[in-house]
């Protein structure tokens, strides 16, 4: 029984017009609302639209009203019931005699013994119906899908508006609204069922649940946009029909005969038989159900659209089977463990849980066969690369089902321990499981709740498939159960992984080998994938490079180039030994020839052309030819770069030499976080009683807005800086840098002169507290003495010369009048020192001892001075003025705070910088003290800072 189905996604439903009147109550065109999740929509398959009611097919059975006025296309004659031109039950390509006979018998019992003639066996046919709407010439149906022999109102749809259901009856004169969380039922396990009034005039001929809230009857109709998920049943609610052939004889008011009025006798007579019929019918109907039947569309496209939303929902920890928690369920998500029957989302009619003895034996069988046949139907597409199954259906379909397996011929884990594609299941296998399910009632009921696993299908790129047999996975289906949908195949083996991280972790196993890339056609192995790719051309006979002279073909371009030299006579490789005029067409020949000239180097390497003067040098060279030579085992501890040879690492470390003797290794910490803390400390420490803070200079203001960390300065044993850093030696000329620095410093001096007046006023405001005179215009010679006077206010800091100048940098825009030790006010005069003062301090001879690696102190995380090696890259780390005006191409360099021993109880909130550290930078330009740049040129005291 082939079920033509299609996964509808939002854009399709959003522009799917339906202009047919619904029970003569609507004459307008309806556009369904946008839906971002897939819906398995039942739509008609027909050769052409039928104008007006279809002509009934001759029927051998008594007239039985059907569930909707639908036209049908009957390629093969079959006993089908019609009443007044209305549609018939949908039976698709299968002999349905037994099920139809049982359905007719059930109908006879339900209506009180009315006669019903069993349907005779018939050849396979294809009859499908319109989804809940009469078809006319103006109807536009874009896709086709399966119309099961069940009322269309039980097709699953995602509920809307927090699980609120709006159920519209067939005559559109009443809308019954329910809430899945607030209903009361005598049978808590009864699945949600559509309400039905006792009156026969209130039968649900074509009913649906609107996605929107309850609306007036004139605005409610059933369409593709309706959320058709059965609402909770009231105490007097009843269950819809399980088969459209089981209806009473009332032609005008067809009411399903299996409606439950909670009468035990009636339940036993009607619903028990109906449930058994539905089980057999649904199991047969699931025989050949495809995943997608959209014309001209890749079956995987509908899944890609909603994959991220589904995965995000499952990661929240809410069970997907709880309608109160999630309010929705998908037909591929396994069994339902409570408050919901499997048939609600499996496109089969629901059966009340109050009669589980007749209905619970088949849910898992229906779902398993449905999913198995979905894969079987598209098996050809799988082989062609259109769609690739990734064992998403094998988790719940095989494990813990009490004998209810998929019946796949390939089996689980078949083919080299990998996960095989589930396919080749026959109709007989599905029938077997349907019968087996009837014999394993209790086991299936227990397994239904125990095996309610959450399985979500995932799209797979066909290019990532392992081979013609399907997907091979190192861990079976579990390795491919998650991820974003992409599949990553190992280049060294056939294994496929769902995430790039898993692939990288797996690759490390191969990288332990000297040559992990092994040829599958021969025993050769290679160190990298490119070599293997070139080698594979030999086995495949691929020779893309052809000589235009002799038409000879080659697998590699280098081979062709060498071959062309035989025609041209070109010998580009010439011997450089004095007096030797030989030349060669190939480099290897030149290398071999060069040995004859190395008479002073008797130690020759047998693997290459190199010769050495002594044996230790040769022994050191030989390991370079070992098989693991491609492994980068030598790693730089400063920048993390790795090299294959120790000599390469040594050369690389020389680049760090001029910096490693001045700074410690990389320390953890976020520059942005530390800068933010410093800015917060600067803003939060301002005392309103001290008056408004002085306006910052433009450069510092821009620096604060950019959120850059403050400048760090630390001691060094050298009294000079390199004029051009090793990393930027080729970027700028030393003279140009000096000239640009000179211009920048002149701009800085002008800014400082404007700032001095405001700083002096601020200093007068604070210094009466401590008796310290203002220091804005003091000669440079007195600056050090005044700083030593301030040092007496910090007796807890040892050694004595240490004094914090952090307020100059960490808090450039606000006076620090509320420091914890009470000495923040006296530092305000130095908030912006004039340029001559800063120059003098920078020119003071250093008293700090030589750099000692053992004296490196750990930088605290609360320091306002961020190690510059943790800042952003150079040219961007100090962009406190526009990049066009920033000519400094140096790398920012940071040094350790060597002798800072402060008491946390009485110290500033941030780490302090001692006077020794400031003195140590005798040749730093003035721009550094203002935070403009770190590196400059070496100048002596008293010289201009050019």
Swiss-Prot record:
Residues 10-30, 156-269, 683-853 are annotated as: Disordered. This is Zinc finger protein rotund. Residues 161-176, 198-230, 242-269, 813-822 have a biased composition (Polar residues). The keyword Phosphoprotein does not apply. Transcription factor involved in imaginal disks development. Isoform rn is required in the wings, antenna, haltere, proboscis and legs disks, while isoform roe is required in the eye disk. Together with nab corepressor, it is involved in the initiation and maintenance of wingless (wg) expression in the wing hinge, by limiting the expression of wg to this compartment. Also required for the epithelial-mesenchymal transition branch of basolateral junctions signaling. Belongs to the krueppel C2H2-type zinc-finger protein family. Gene3D superfamilies: Classic Zinc Finger. The keyword Metal-binding applies. GO terms for cellular component: nucleus. It comes from the Eukaryota. Its main location: nucleus. PANTHER family: TRANSCRIPTIONAL REPRESSOR PROTEIN YY (PTHR14003), ZINC FINGER PROTEIN 143 (PTHR14003:SF23). Residues 828-841 have a biased composition (Basic and acidic residues). Interacts with nab; which acts as a corepressor. InterPro entries: Znf_C2H2_sf, Znf_C2H2_type. A zinc finger (C2H2-type) spans 488-510, 517-539, 545-567, 573-597, 603-625, 634-656. GO terms for biological process: cell fate specification; chaeta development; compound eye development; imaginal disc-derived leg morphogenesis; negative regulation of DNA-templated transcription; negative regulation of transcription by RNA polymerase II; regulation of transcription by RNA polymerase II. It is found in: Nucleus. It holds the Pfam family zf-C2H2. It comes from Drosophila melanogaster (Fruit fly). Isoform rn and isoform roe are expressed in non-overlapping domains in the larval imaginal disks. Isoform rn is first expressed during the early third larval instar in the leg, wing, haltere and antennal part of the eye-antennal imaginal disk. It is observed as a ring in the leg and antenna disks and in the presumptive wing pouch and capitellum of wing and haltere disks respectively. In wing disk it is expressed in 3 concentric domains in the wing pouch. In late third instar, expression of isoform rn in the leg disk is no longer evident, but is maintained in the other disks. Keywords: Metal-binding, Nucleus, Repeat, Transcription, Transcription regulation, Zinc, Zinc-finger. Residues 177-188, 739-762, 770-790 have a biased composition (Low complexity). GO terms for molecular function: DNA-binding transcription factor activity, RNA polymerase II-specific; RNA polymerase II cis-regulatory region sequence-specific DNA binding; RNA polymerase II transcription regulatory region sequence-specific DNA binding; zinc ion binding.
């Amino acid at each position: 029984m082939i079920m033509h189905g299609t996964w509808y996604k939002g854009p399709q439903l959003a522009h799917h017009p339906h202009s047919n009147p619904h029970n003569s109550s609507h004459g307008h065109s309806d556009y369904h609302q946008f839906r971002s999740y897939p819906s398995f929509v039942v739509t008609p398959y027909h050769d052409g639209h039928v104008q007006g009611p279809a002509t009934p097919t001759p029927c051998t059975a008594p007239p039985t009203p059907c569930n909707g006025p639908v036209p049908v296309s009957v390629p093969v004659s079959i006993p089908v019931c019609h009443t007044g031109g209305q549609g018939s039950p949908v039976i698709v390509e299968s002999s349905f005699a037994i099920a139809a006979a049982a359905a007719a018998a059930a109908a006879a019992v339900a209506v009180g013994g009315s006669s019903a003639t069993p349907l005779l066996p018939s050849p396979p046919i294809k009859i499908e119906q319109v989804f809940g709407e009469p078809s006319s010439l103006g109807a536009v149906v874009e896709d086709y899908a399966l119309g099961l022999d069940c009322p269309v109102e039980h097709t699953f749809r995602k509920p809307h508006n927090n699980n609120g259901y709006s159920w519209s009856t067939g005559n559109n004169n009443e809308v019954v609204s329910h809430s899945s969380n607030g209903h009361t039922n005598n049978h808590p396990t009864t699945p949600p069922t559509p309400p039905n009034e006792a009156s026969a005039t209130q039968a649900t001929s074509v009913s649906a649940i609107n996605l929107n809230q309850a609306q007036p009857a004139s605005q409610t109709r059933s369409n593709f946009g309706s959320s058709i998920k059965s609402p909770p049943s009231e105490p007097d609610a009843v269950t819809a029909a399980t088969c459209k052939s089981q209806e009473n004889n009332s032609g005008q008011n067809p009411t399903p005969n299996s409606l439950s009025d909670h009468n035990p006798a009636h339940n036993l007579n009607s619903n028990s038989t109906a449930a058994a019929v539905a089980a057999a019918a649904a199991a047969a109907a699931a025989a050949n159900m495809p995943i997608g039947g959209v014309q001209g569309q890749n079956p995987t496209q509908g899944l890609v659209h909603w994959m991220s939303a589904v995965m995000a929902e499952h990661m929240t920890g809410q069970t997907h089977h709880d309608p109160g928690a999630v309010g929705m369920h998908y037909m591929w998500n396994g069994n339902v463990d409570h408050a919901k029957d499997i048939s609600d989302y499996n496109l089969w009619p629901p059966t009340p849980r109050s009669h589980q003895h007749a209905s619970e034996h088949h849910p898992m069988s229906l779902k398993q066969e449905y999913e198995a046949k979905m894969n079987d139907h598209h098996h050809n597409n799988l082989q062609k690369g259109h769609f690739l199954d990734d064992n998403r259906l094998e988790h719940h379909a095989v494990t813990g089902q009490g004998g209810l397996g998929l019946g796949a011929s390939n089996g689980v884990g078949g083919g080299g321990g990998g996960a095989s594609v589930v396919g080749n299941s026959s109709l007989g296998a599905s029938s077997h499981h349907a019968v087996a399910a009837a014999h394993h009632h209790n086991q299936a009921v227990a397994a239904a709740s125990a095996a309610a696993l959450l399985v979500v299908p995932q799209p797979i790129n066909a290019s990532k498939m392992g081979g013609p047999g399907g997907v091979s996975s190192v861990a079976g289906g579990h390795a491919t159960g998650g991820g974003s949908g992409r599949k990553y195949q190992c280049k060294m083996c056939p294994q496929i992984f769902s995430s790039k991280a898993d692939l990288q972790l797996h690759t490390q196993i191969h990288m332990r080998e000297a040559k992990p890339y092994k040829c599958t056609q021969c025993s050769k192995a290679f160190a990298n994938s490119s070599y293997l790719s070139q080698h594979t051309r030999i086995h495949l006979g691929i020779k893309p490079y052809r000589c235009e002279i002799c038409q000879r073909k080659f697998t590699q371009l280098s081979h062709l180039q060498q071959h062309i030299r035989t025609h041209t006579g070109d010998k580009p490789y010439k011997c450089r030994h004095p007096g030797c005029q030989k030349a060669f067409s190939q480099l290897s020949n030149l290398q071999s020839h060069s040995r004859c000239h190395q008479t002073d180097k008797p130690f020759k390497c047998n693997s290459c052309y190199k010769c050495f003067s002594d044996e230790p040098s040769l022994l050191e060279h030989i390991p370079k030819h070992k098989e693991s030579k491609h492994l980068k085992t030598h790693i730089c501890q400063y920048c993390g770069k790795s090299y294959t040879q120790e000599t390469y690492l040594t050369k690389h470390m020389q680049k760090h030499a001029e910096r490693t003797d001045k700074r410690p290794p990389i320390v953890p910490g976020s520059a942005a976080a530390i800068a933010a803390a410093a800015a917060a400390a600067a803003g939060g420490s301002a005392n309103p009683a001290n008056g408004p803070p002085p306006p910052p200079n433009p450069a510092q203001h821009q620096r604060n807005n950019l959120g850059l960390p403050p400048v760090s300065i630390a001691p060094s044993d050298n009294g000079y800086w390199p004029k051009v850093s090793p990393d930027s030696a080729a970027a700028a000329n030393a003279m140009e840098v000096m000239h640009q620095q000179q211009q920048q410093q002149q701009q800085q001096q002008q800014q400082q002169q404007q700032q001095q007046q405001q700083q002096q006023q601020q200093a007068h405001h604070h210094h009466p507290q401590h008796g310290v005179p203002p220091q804005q215009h003091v000669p440079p010679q007195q600056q050090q003495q005044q700083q030593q006077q301030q040092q007496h206010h910090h007796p807890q800091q040892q050694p004595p010369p240490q004094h914090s100048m952090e307020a100059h940098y960490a808090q450039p825009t606000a006076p620090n009048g509320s420091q914890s030790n009470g000495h923040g006010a006296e530092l305000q005069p130095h908030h912006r020192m004039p340029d001559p003062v800063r120059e003098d301090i920078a020119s003071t001879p250093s008293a700090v001892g030589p750099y000692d690696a053992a004296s490196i102190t750990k930088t605290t995380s609360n320091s306002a001075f961020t190690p510059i090696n943790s800042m952003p890259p150079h040219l961007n780390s100090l962009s406190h003025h526009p990049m066009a005006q920033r000519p400094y191409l140096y790398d920012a360099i940071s040094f350790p705070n060597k002798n800072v021993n402060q008491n946390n109880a009485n110290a500033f909130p941030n780490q302090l910088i001692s006077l020794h550290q400031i003195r140590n930078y005798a040749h730093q330009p003035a721009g550094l003290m203002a935070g403009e740049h770190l590196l400059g040129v070496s100048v002596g005291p008293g010289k201009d800072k050019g």
